[in-house]
């Protein structure tokens, strides 16, 4: 193993080998006997040694070449390795007196350095001939390695001596010139000498000559390293060009650890970007510290074989592009044709109807407001002609002045301009939840990027966190989450009603509110026009009213109830009535009489916490106000989560044309979520069927009743369903104090898991799809014994058991809502080996 170079300096004489000491002794003797002023002798010796190394050096393999440990020194560099073999007691330069004494004497021919060098070179040639005559020892044999190593050391010593002599010769010349300039002797007077500028120019020429010689030496050395012996008795040949290095294999070489530590291995390379002598088509590998002209190849250019590879690569790329580009164009055209066949493009804003409209048509006072169509994310389907007209204080901007109510969704339903036979024909509708009133479990993408530290759990905190970007981000959600295509699909699924959620900030906001104001209003109006286009009737549903009616995230703000309760309870009561005053004036227009056929007061007021009488009084007052303003639609009041049997005695003296709205789920009740698949279907067809049928009558119940929300979800596994960051009853992670899992196999096993319920619907088994479809059809059958139903909800990002659209397209919802395969009274089908914990 090579010795660490610094160790050789530090421990000289203790760990060096006998050949090393011989080399140092020989070097000292050479320093004493050499005439440092004999320039011609130095050059002759150097040239002779170069020829010797080139022509007669021992045959070595490439891996043993001395080039792996050799490196260039600049002639002016002071390097510790150059001095390693010298005796500190022997001065590098003799005094002037010694030099004059030596120059005065004459050398004997036998003792002259030239004679000794000739004898030494002759001895070496004779030794080489003797080795060749006897046959070279095997590669790696001990004596071969020892002789080669000793010669290598001596050759390196010669090179070091030559560099040192040249350095000292130059210094002596400079000192002599300086001494002459300083002399007062007329012989040495400055008037007989060159000027300082001339001397500087002369030194510059010397330096240039030295650099040129050093560069030539480096090039010769590099060429020497590329040679290798083939066999002992055959001439040398150039190494073949390197083959492609396998990927992952290092291109580096093993060198002295000291050299690597110093960063001075001759094979260490760095990569330079672009440029450089060969044309810069790609990055070039250069020796560290080398200039561009030192690259492989003549005069810094790229070798032919590399150029050939480059041209081949360029040709391949050109051929591939010639194939790929036409294919891409064809595919792009096909995709564009497919997109043009659809009614909407869900990903990009559609603003083509602004073409031909001048920005100057918008008054200065309206520019940059909700009345300025150039600020709208999506203008398709809107009338972008400016108007500041309002009805009930609410803008009609975006509406067309004409409409057509002759459409119907299917042949089972009368057109819009004919009355719908409520009471004799059931409603088959769907909700647009999570759209204009945002809910985390329906659109989790709006909430997933925040941590629990951010506290983003509802629309209030979302808008607060978004800050100035809230309006643009939320309008993009409005424009893309529900589009015209959704209304066409709702019609095609056999549905005939749509329950549209919106909140009070569509109408107005108050000091301190974080919500985005009024933008959702125009999307509500456009949605109604899309419903008109496809013959769908509308139920309006205020999901969030001032102060929050239940404190849940879908009311806008999760937390305490501030409506009819708390410090601002009465203020928010007044505000909510003002909201209905404006809304009822607007929707009492003739254009809405045939399409807005059901008008909701408030979604899910928490009557288990609020004073029941206060809620009933507000409901009566609001209904009278609405009807006074001209609303002829049915007005709905929610059951407030009270037992339906209690409603038999409530609001018995109420205004006409009112519906009771109830929401039925099995997953939020721990006694029902643990039921097995067949038991849940029997619960719906036996208990719910009779309950809904009874409450729908005025004699034994309350009167006309609809089911405004239900789903086919049989677990509460959906992300964020129980609030952001809350667990599930199904797996026992819902309660902070109770880890009981509520699923059919919780006690007997296997353990409950949400992985199956939350899987992609394409992975649902046929048995599970059969259950989900039967479970949905059973609920349809039960709710159709009253006024009908609205499924919750039409579209979700990732909750298939809550999305009518996903179920319909994946085969676990009837293809036509009016033509189910199962109804209560039929035999419950066998679900095979469907696991109960699925």
Swiss-Prot record:
InterPro entries linked to this entry: Glyco_hydro_5, Glycoside_hydrolase_SF, Glycosyl_hydrolase_5
Reaction equations catalysed: Successive hydrolysis of beta-D-glucose units from the non-reducing ends of (1->3)-beta-D-glucans, releasing alpha-glucose
GO biological process: one example: glucan catabolic process
Domain of life: Eukaryota
Annotated region (Disordered), positions in chain: 1-298, 335-359
Membrane topology classification: Single-pass type II membrane protein
Protein EC: 3.2.1.58
Residue positions the entry lists as glycosylated: 383, 388, 400, 553, 565, 643, 696
Extracellular topology ranges: 332-838
Location, primary (coarse class): membrane
Cell inner membrane recorded as keyword: no
Cytoplasmic topology ranges: 1-310
Single GO term (MF): glucan exo-1,3-beta-glucosidase activity
Glycoprotein is among the record's keywords: yes
Compositional bias per record (Basic and acidic residues), positions renumbered to this chain: 1-23, 111-124, 149-164, 200-221, 234-246
Keywords noted in UniProt: Carbohydrate metabolism, Cell membrane, Cell wall biogenesis/degradation, Glycoprotein, Glycosidase, Hydrolase, Membrane, Polysaccharide degradation, Signal-anchor, Transmembrane, Transmembrane helix
GO CC annotations on file: cell surface; extracellular region; plasma membrane
Compositionally biased tracts (Acidic residues): 35-45
Compartments where located: Cell membrane
Chain segments annotated as transmembrane: 311-331
UniProt-annotated catalytic positions: 604 (proton donor), 709 (nucleophile)
PANTHER family in alphabetical order: GLUCAN 1,3-BETA-GLUCOSIDASE 2, GLUCAN ENDO-1,6-BETA-GLUCOSIDASE B
Functional note: Glucosidase involved in the degradation of cellulosic biomass. Active on lichenan.
Family, per entry: Belongs to the glycosyl hydrolase 5 (cellulase A) family.
UniProt name for this protein: Probable glucan 1,3-beta-glucosidase D
Organism: Aspergillus terreus (strain NIH 2624 / FGSC A1156)
Highest classification ranks of the organism: Eukaryota, Fungi, Dikarya, Ascomycota, Pezizomycotina
